[in-house]
A protein has these predicted regions:
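Bacterial Sec-dependent N-terminal signal peptides
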Residues: 1-22
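Carbohydrate-interacting regions of secretory-pathway proteins
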Residues: 19-212
Length: 212
């Protein structure tokens, strides 16, 4: 019995220590451990995603990597999210929020935040894709930058490094055109986009700060 109680005590200390280590200052929590896909789930074309030097690399046919870990049971409504991102020339990718796992195709639920500094699509990094688009190029290829998303109620703020590039308020009872019906504030998880075989984009230090 004493040995069992000792085991429970040690186990409790380990779990508490891990939880404290996982939580960063001011409520930030890591979603990616830098070495494995634990807590993530990919739909089609799993080989599009790999891990190199502590970063997720998106390079290959269309694919999406969804967070399905334990933080908030991968269901976020109000939050701050940030990731360090590096694009290579001619690359396109995206970060989804309020989405849900799909086996294939482009996510139908939630919003996409664009990652694109030089690819042919004119919508540049920081765009709330096809909703509030950014034409300016704020960062260069082959340079790490931080892309941040904050959702509070119906308000979305997107930042590139410390610069706000999008402030968007979703109208009440918003109606989207055909094919975009799912682009609405709700709740859900995050996803990383693998856009095409010519695109190679890196993601690391993926963090979330739940606000509810």
């Amino acid at each position: 019995m004493k040995n069992f109680l000792l085991f429970l005590s040690i186990f409790s200390i380990i779990i508490t220590s891990q939880a404290q280590e996982k939580a960063n200052n001011d409520g930030w929590v890591s979603l990616f451990d830098g070495k494995s896909f634990d807590g993530w789930k990919v739909g089609e074309n799993a080989s599009t995603f790999s891990i190199q030097d502590g970063a997720i690399v998106a390079n290959g046919p269309v694919a999406h990597l969804f967070y399905n870990g334990d933080v908030k049971n991968h269901d976020f409504k109000n939050f701050e999210f940030k990731a360090d991102v590096m694009t290579t020339p001619g690359s396109n990718s995206g970060l989804y929020f309020h989405t849900v796992f799909q086996d294939s195709s482009w996510p139908q639920k939630g919003y996409e935040v664009q990652v694109n500094n030089s690819q042919e699509d004119w919508r540049r990094t920081g765009s709330l894709y096809a909703i509030e688009d950014v034409k300016e190029v704020y960062v260069k290829d082959n340079v790490w930058y931080t892309e941040s998303i904050k959702v509070q109620g119906k308000h979305v703020t997107i930042k590139i490094n410390d610069k706000i590039v999008v402030e968007y308020d979703e109208p009440e009872n918003v109606q989207r055109p055909a094919g975009m019906e799912g682009r609405k504030i709700s709740s859900g998880t995050f996803a990383i986009q693998g856009h095409d075989p010519k695109s190679k984009v890196y993601f690391k230090n993926i963090m979330v700060k739940p606000l509810d």
